[in-house]
């Protein structure tokens, strides 16, 4: 605990998101999915109410959890037309504002994208810098990584994509 307040100096949050892919294999070269703000050419689309960016959804969820503000689903429900096709950076920006209102900054973020395809790591650095552009997080404190499920389960059958994020929030001075 800080000497000067009753709020903890550090708080940790974890977030998770998953979305299904459509079952249509699109031969259209303009087909893409958005992960951590970066468009990636892919022959399937993500089924979602917003832009379906699992990486940014997990990040927003982690930030909200760290500062005790519930979940992304509570703040941006998929039943609200306001969020239809919304860009997920908005969710992260709003979550960061809630953290700041409670006296915290985001010190570190670690995001893992879980899918068989498409390959994520060629875009990791671009994703890291994109997230740094609209958050207070230094790019060197944003980590993007990817894994597969070794072809196990729905994600292993390439039916969808998931992400987990963990953040460390520090008390502002």
Curated annotation (Swiss-Prot):
The record marks 49, 148 as: Transition state stabilizer. Binds 1 divalent metal cation per subunit. One of its GO terms (biological process) is terpenoid biosynthetic process. Pathway: Isoprenoid biosynthesis; isopentenyl diphosphate biosynthesis via DXP pathway; isopentenyl diphosphate from 1-deoxy-D-xylulose 5-phosphate: step 4/6. InterPro entries: MECDP_synthase, MECDP_synthase_CS, MECDP_synthase_sf. Keywords: Isoprene biosynthesis, Lyase, Metal-binding. 4-CDP-2-C-methyl-D-erythritol 2-phosphate binds at residues 17-19, 49-50, 76-80, 147-150, 157. The keyword Hydrolase does not apply. One of its GO terms (molecular function) is 2-C-methyl-D-erythritol 2,4-cyclodiphosphate synthase activity. CDD domains: MECDP_synthase. It catalyses: 4-CDP-2-C-methyl-D-erythritol 2-phosphate = 2-C-methyl-D-erythritol 2,4-cyclic diphosphate + CMP. Its EC number is 4.6.1.12. Coiled coil: none annotated. Transmembrane segments: none annotated. Its cofactor is a divalent metal cation. A divalent metal cation binds at residues 17, 19, 57. Pfam families: YgbB. It comes from the Bacteria. Belongs to the IspF family. Homotrimer. NCBIfam families: ispF. Involved in the biosynthesis of isopentenyl diphosphate (IPP) and dimethylallyl diphosphate (DMAPP), two major building blocks of isoprenoid compounds. Catalyzes the conversion of 4-diphosphocytidyl-2-C-methyl-D-erythritol 2-phosphate (CDP-ME2P) to 2-C-methyl-D-erythritol 2,4-cyclodiphosphate (ME-CPP) with a corresponding release of cytidine 5-monophosphate (CMP). This is 2-C-methyl-D-erythritol 2,4-cyclodiphosphate synthase. It comes from Ehrlichia ruminantium (strain Welgevonden).
């Amino acid at each position: 605990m800080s000497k000067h307040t009753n709020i903890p100096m550090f708080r940790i949050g974890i977030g998770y998101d998953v979305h299904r892919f459509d079952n249509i294999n699109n031969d259209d070269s303009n087909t893409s999915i958005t992960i951590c703000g970066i468009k990636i050419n892919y022959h399937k689309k993500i089924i979602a109410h917003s832009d379906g960016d699992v990486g940014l959804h997990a990040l927003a969820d982690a930030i909200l959890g760290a500062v005790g503000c519930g979940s992304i689903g509570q703040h941006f429900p998929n039943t609200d037309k306001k969020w239809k096709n919304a860009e997920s950076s908005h969710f992260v920006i709003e979550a960061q504002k809630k953290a700041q209102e409670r006296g915290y900054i985001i010190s570190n973020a670690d995001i893992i994208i879980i899918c068989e395809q498409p390959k994520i790591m060629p875009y990791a650095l671009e994703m890291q810098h994109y997230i740094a552009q609209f958050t207070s997080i230094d790019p060197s404190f944003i980590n993007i990584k990817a894994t597969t499920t070794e072809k196990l389960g729905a994600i292993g059958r390439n039916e969808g994509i998931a992400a987990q994020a963990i953040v460390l929030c520090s008390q502002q001075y």
